[in-house]
A protein has these predicted regions:
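Glycoside hydrolase catalytic-domain context in secreted enzymes
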Residues: 1-225
Length: 225
């Protein structure tokens, strides 16, 4: 007999409420765990290693595979094992970096964030993100680690190329367009990154102390988010 949470004709809220009522505390904790799909994860029984289920899988190992078909095959195999091993057959969320495209060999590669911002074209940005979402979902990936909303005003910072640059208004427009393209038709979840003032470290040093006034934090670093 089909349970309510398995009925796709019901709303997500109804299905989630029914499923949560059937899960014990350990199973709920299992859904907030994230595993890296490295050799130690791939080489063991999913059921024995994760008896309470798997919530999310980092699939960066796909960057080491030869093509998108291999990546899709790996994800499908892992997803099948995860769903078959759990009592409630809950699929895991697979995530990967997508700032310049799905980070898999032979997937479409786009310019870096700074290059994207240089177009001054949110409409094209939205189309690019839709393409990324379409390719990611085709491989079984539903969570994108992008866009990067950080504001960077120090060219010494080694990760400046990931950002949309120094202007919070432009970053807000480009990042918002990215999220819309990603989540609209193909429904790939975005992850707005990273933290307020993350790229304001002293000396342009990654993770160095950031000295930022409350006003600058609000008007510059928080604005895109």
């Amino acid at each position: 007999m089909m349970q309510k949470y398995q009925d796709s004709s019901l709303s997500p809220e109804e299905r989630a409420s029914d499923l949560l009522a059937r899960m014990n505390l350990d199973e709920k904790f299992g859904q907030i765990q994230c595993y890296n799909a490295i050799d130690s994860f791939l080489g063991k029984s999913v059921e024995k290693q994760n008896p309470y289920g798997v919530g999310q899988v980092c699939i960066l190992i796909a960057t080491m595979l030869d093509d998108v078909g291999s990546a899709a095959g790996l994800i499908a195999r892992l997803q099948k094992q995860i769903m078959e091993s759990g009592k409630h057959h809950i699929p895991a969320i697979f995530h990967i970096e997508t700032l310049t495209g799905v980070m898999v060999t032979a997937a479409t590669s786009f310019p870096c964030g700074l290059g994207q911002a240089s177009t001054w074209d949110p409409e094209q940005q939205q189309k690019m993100a839709a393409c990324i979402a379409r390719q990611g979902r085709a491989m079984g990936i539903s969570h994108a680690l992008a866009p990067v909303f950080d504001i960077c005003r120090d060219p010494r910072f080694g990760r400046m190329g990931e950002t949309y640059g120094e202007d919070p208004t432009l970053a807000a427009a480009m990042g918002t367009a990215y999220v819309k393209g990603l989540q609209d038709k193909h429904r790939m979840s975005a992850c707005s990154k990273h933290f307020l003032g993350f790229m304001a470290g002293q000396g342009g040093i990654h993770t160095a102390q950031a000295v930022v006034s409350p006003r600058e934090l609000r008007e510059v670093y928080a604005k895109p988010l």
